[in-house]
């Protein structure tokens, strides 16, 4: 049972947090901020220090090649350096933008956002905005624009749930063959991901996953019932 002071604290916390429709009015997502997806990508690249560092090296090498194009020996060395730098740039870009953020507190934050806000439709924009701010404040991303839109955030959440659930199902179905598995194959999830993770071994996190999954399904069902009130949707 909560004490009067605890009840007061809960009420104050609730009052301090703006409601979803008020947040939505001030939500600034990349799809609303940038004129195109290309301009968004260029902005992200410009604020990623490792990528900008590699670009500066490549531009410098190109300038040196133009400057010393009459010197064959120097040109060969510079061209080889340019090739290596270009390959390094691709690796850095793939590592930076191709790898999903899987920091545990970030995933907990996302699950709790879904549980608390019961998002559907445009409400995912609010969740995306809050997650973008969280990632930026925690220095897990270079800009406050990780999720391009609410749709992208919803897709990330759906992928997270699928990976965790598919891992759970594969774990339970393979218990009988556990003794014959190699340590390497036993440690992998679908798609070779090792990291949807410690979630399955953490009962609290799994409880969040199950709760968020249930609430998201209910929110989606309610959303479509409101969109089509005469359709008698289940």
Swiss-Prot record:
Belongs to the DUP/COS family. GO terms for biological process: cellular response to toxic substance. This is Protein-toxin resistance protein KTD1. Residues 69-76 are extracellular. Keywords: Endosome, Golgi apparatus, Isopeptide bond, Membrane, Transmembrane, Transmembrane helix, Ubl conjugation, Vacuole. Residues 68-75, 147-234 are annotated as: Required for resistance to killer toxin K28, a protein-toxin encoded by the M28 virus. The gene is KTD1. It is a multi-pass membrane protein. InterPro entries: DUP/COS (IPR001142). The lineage of its organism: Eukaryota, Fungi, Dikarya, Ascomycota, Saccharomycotina. It comes from the Eukaryota. It comes from Saccharomyces cerevisiae (strain ATCC 204508 / S288c) (Baker's yeast). Present with 1835 molecules/cell in log phase SD medium. GO terms for cellular component: endosome membrane; fungal-type vacuole membrane; Golgi apparatus.
